[in-house]
Regions:
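Extended, low-polarity transmembrane helix blocks
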Residues: 1-31, 38, 52, 56, ...
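Cytosolic, membrane-interface loops and tails of multi-pass inner-membrane proteins
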Residues: 34-49
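Hydrophobic, membrane-inserted alpha-helices
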Residues: 60-69
Length: 173
């Protein structure tokens, strides 16, 4: 295996691991959203207006962006989705719980921080040669500083826009 193959293998592994994990979260959300109001009620308890809409939005984003990452399709946009979900999760739920994910009652922010930086890295590095972006000859156009800018601006901007439109922090008792 030469250096290029090693880099492509590493990027593939990172994309697949992140994409499958993201898709798995979406799959669980889909099952729970369809079962009843539990997920929507949880979004509402975080201060999200239109909690059912927000539950469906995050579910569909996770179900769509996960496979996009796995296959390396429009990678900076998929990375932006990961970043956006992580930003919203951090601000609404995880930031007050401390760093470690096992902190209770809500998990700490280490996981969402890791997702944010993985999204930024994939935006900058691109999907590698073993991807649909490469097969469609757009990988070079959508990586480097362009990919990083797309992932960061769309991810952070999209997350902050969602918060601006929907989030009203609950008053602490």
């Amino acid at each position: 295996m030469d250096d290029a193959d090693a880099i492509n293998a590493a990027l593939l592994a990172l994309r697949v691991a992140t994409g499958l994990m993201f898709f798995a979260h979406g799959w669980v959300h889909l099952r729970r959203v369809r079962e009843g109001p539990g997920v929507a009620n949880w979004f509402g308890s975080l201060g999200m207006r239109q909690p059912t809409l927000n539950a469906w939005m995050v579910t569909l984003v996770e179900l769509g962006a996960g496979p996009m990452l796995v296959f390396g399709l429009l990678t900076p946009l998929a990375a932006a989705a990961v970043i956006g979900v992580a930003v919203v999760a951090w601000i609404t739920n995880h930031r007050k719980a401390g760093f470690f994910v096992y902190n209770r009652p809500t998990e700490g922010w280490e996981y969402v921080m890791l997702l944010t930086f993985v999204g930024l890295a994939l935006g900058a590095l691109g999907p590698g040669e073993w991807s649909l972006d490469h097969a469609f000859d757009v990988a070079d156009d959508l990586s480097g500083s362009t990919g990083l800018a797309i992932a960061a601006a769309a991810g952070i901007g999209g997350g902050l826009l969602q918060l601006l439109v929907f989030w009203r922090p609950p008053r602490e008792a």
